[in-house]
Regions:
Chain B
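C-terminal coupling/interaction segments
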Residues: 2-10, 15, 288-332
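ABC transporter nucleotide-binding domains
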Residues: 15-18, 22-226, 231-232
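A generic structural signal for secondary-structure junctions
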Residues: 28, 92, 123, 162, ...
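Short loop or secondary-structure boundary microenvironments that flank
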Residues: 86, 253, 257, 288, ...
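Alpha-helical elements of the RecA-like P-loop NTPase motor core of helicases
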Residues: 90, 107, 261, 292, ...
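Short loop/turn segments at beta->alpha junctions
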Residues: 110, 125, 235, 287-290, ...
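A short linear hydrophobic-aromatic micro-motif
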Residues: 141, 189, 271-276, 304-309
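ABC transporter nucleotide-binding domain
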Residues: 192-285
């Protein structure tokens, strides 16, 4: 059933978890390779490194005991942002490129499900982003040490949370790129990202006693809708709390991870549903 | 006119591997979502070991229906069975090798890497992949370029890598979209020979072509499309033999208008005879068995027979006739 033996005795494993995994792995491999060739990727990586170098210069202006602190907060803010940029741009372009260059037409007719293809793209991009985040974190660590600071366990956990956010943004990007053309899907993803980053602010405003969100009913409804349909990305940005000495306990990390992965799954499933209905003419 | 698929079932044939049931596809284009009917109610069936030519001019709907067979496109209505399954089932597609129309692959990969990748998608193990890659790149004559990135490959070379990857998993059915187009004469000859060899090995071949010449030797059966409609299908021998039973004659009619009218009236009584004015004279196309009646009518009516020959239809004649019938026959 799950295996097919060809006319000349070749064994094809088609069904079953191992076969599915092998196919997804093949897509992941090719995606990493393709995305890893993109000039865009190296541009963003180079930009992030430049910004880190800039933070060193900037920290010269700071008070002696504030130097490491500045590098620390700068890194925690800038590194994830640069990776999010990569996720949004590559996520918007990757699927479209396969359609545009017609490479998809040779791949989808193979015994592979469209869901496996999307999963492969998602995991491939995630792998690349993990590499980017790791490289940048290493450089950041070097700069921190240079400025008399250190990379603490809470800071590492904080970066881990940022990676969960990256996974989520990647699946949002794939969702929109299964839906529309690259520019629009990039814009939409950016929109959701920004909205997600500020939902906690809106939440605060909603529960305040004064202000437009508290007092104007239409704004209140809009705010509530936004809070309901957009994942709260503030969950994954804890650098301020870390600076104030918060330990980022594992209970928080696991709850936030579960939250992020659930949302990522929602968007990934949405991407698959959209992608499965598409005609590739 | 169009034979219903059910009528050509023949128990001596192998198992059914592909069936189209009233396949239709309508695209909506532009701001007003104008309907373009690319494929209309095409029914066909194919058996193991057969080689079927899917023929028709550009834009007749070949690629669209082929993409439906591979689940790249969802039919608007109708159904496709591939090895008794839906084309969306990977197990059905596992037995198919598809060559896209003007194939494209990742241009940063080498032929070896393309084959490896495709082999993985078919669930072949590493050793088999390596062995098949080597065999197939040799078969299509790409062993010299095996480790060069596809960027910079000519169209003919891309077609070769397309063919190699379609054969990777030793599929039972090859679905090739325009395998002969875009090749130079030598390349065409090589691909034709490969197709004949694959057929000899017992592979089933479904291929499309917009060029009707020089493919007669490649197919047992044809399905001819015209503007999305299957206008003729069946075994090539049957389709063309029927036309070998026709004759064509070149006539001289009497110069006297009254005699001419009389003779024309006599000729019109011969069943199945059609007259056509050619620059060289009047041509009559008629069933071969009616030739004696024609000669008799000519002798009595003062006409002359200048030429008489059996009508050997080519695929092109067949297509032209069917397409004309359709335009005249009041079908939209
Ligand atoms: N994506 C599409 N949108 C609109 N019309 C299309 C699309 N793809 C094909 N068509 C139309 O469908 C018809 C059949 O095209 P196609 O299947 O490519 O023909 P063939 O392969 O026989 O040359 C053509 O009229 C073509 O313009
Ligand atoms: Mg075509």
């Amino acid at each position: 059933m799950s295996q097919h033996v060809s006319q000349h005795g070749l064994k094809l494993s088609i069904g079953g978890p191992a076969a599915i995994l092998a196919r997804v792995a093949a897509i992941v491999g090719n995606t990493v390779r393709e995305a890893g060739r993109a000039k865009l990727f190296y541009g963003l990586l180079g930009g992030a490194l430049l910004l880190l170098a800039f933070s060193v210069v900037l920290s010269d202006l700071a008070l002696v005991d504030q130097k490491a602190r500045l590098v620390q907060s700068f890194g925690m803010a800038v590194i994830p942002l640069m990776c999010v940029g990569t996720a949004i741009l590559l996520g918007a372009v990757l699927l479209h490129k396969e359609i545009d260059k017609k490479t998809l037409y040779a791949i989808l007719p193979k015994p592979i499900r469209r869901s496996e293809f999307i999963l492969g793209k998602l995991l491939g991009l995630s792998t690349l982003l993990l590499a980017e985040l790791a490289v940048l974190t290493l450089c950041w660590w070097a700069v921190l040490v240079l400025r008399g600071g250190e990379l603490t366990a809470p800071m590492l956990r904080g970066m881990g949370l940022q990676y969960v956010e990256l996974l989520l943004v990647t699946s949002i990007a794939l969702f929109f790129s299964a839906l529309s053309r690259p520019v629009l899907s990039g814009v939409l993803t950016t929109g959701v990202f920004i909205a997600g980053r500020v939902t906690y602010v809106i939440n605060d405003l909603l529960s305040a006693t004064k202000g437009v969100f508290a007092e104007v009913p239409a704004m209140r409804a809009l705010g509530k809708l936004l809070v309901a349909v957009v994942p709260d990305l503030g969950t994954f940005s804890v650098s301020d709390q870390i600076l104030q000495g918060w330990e980022v306990p594992w209970t928080y990390v696991s709850a936030a991870t579960l939250y992020g992965l659930s949302w990522a799954a929602v968007f990934a499933i949405g991407a698959v549903l959209l992608f499965e209905r598409r005609d590739f003419t | 006119m169009t034979q219903p698929a059910e009528q050509i079932v023949d128990p001596s044939r192998g198992p059914e591997i592909l069936r189209l049931r009233q396949l239709s596809k309508t695209f909506r284009v532009g701001f007003w979502a104008t309907r373009v009917q690319a494929v209309r109610d095409v029914s066909a069936v194919m058996y193991q070991g057969e080689s079927i030519g899917y023929l028709g001019p550009n834009g007749s709907g070949k690629t669209t229906s082929i993409k439906c067979m591979l689940a790249l496109i969802q039919p608007s209505s109708g159904k496709i069975e591939l090895f008794g399954r839906s084309p969306t089932d990977p197990l059905a597609r596992a037995r198919v090798g598809y060559l896209p129309e003007s194939p494209y692959f990742y241009d940063y990969l080498t032929p070896v890497e393309v084959c490896e990748y495709v082999g993985k998608l078919y669930g072949l193990d590493a050793r088999t992949r390596k062995q098949r890659t080597q065999e197939l790149l040799g078969l299509v004559g790409l062993d010299q370029a095996a480790k060069r990135p596809l960027r910079g490959f000519s169209k003919g070379m891309l077609q070769r890598i397309g063919i190699a990857q379609s054969l990777m998993a030793d599929p039972d059915l090859l679905i090739w979209d325009e395998p002969l187009s875009g090749l130079d004469p030598l390349g065409r000859k090589e691909v034709r020979e490969l197709m004949i060899e694959l057929r000899r090995q017992g592979k089933s071949l479904f291929f499309s072509s917009h060029v009707l010449t020089d493919i007669e030797a490649l197919c047992d059966g044809v399905c001819i499309l015209d503007r999305g409609v299957a206008v003729a299908q069946g075994r090539l021998a049957d389709l063309l033999r029927r036309d070998a039973l026709e004759s064509e004659a070149l006539l001289d009619l009497p110069a006297d208008p009254q005699l001419e009218a009389g003779l024309r009236a006599e000729l019109a009584k011969i069943p199945g005879l059609a007259l056509q004015q050619l620059p060289t004279g009047v041509q009559a196309v008629l069933p071969t068995q009616a030739v004696p009646a024609l000669i008799q009518a000519l002798m009595q009516g003062g006409g002359q027979l200048r030429e008489l020959s059996a009508r050997r239809d080519s695929l092109e004649d067949l297509f032209m006739r069917k397409a004309l019938q359709r335009s005249d026959g009041g079908q939209p």
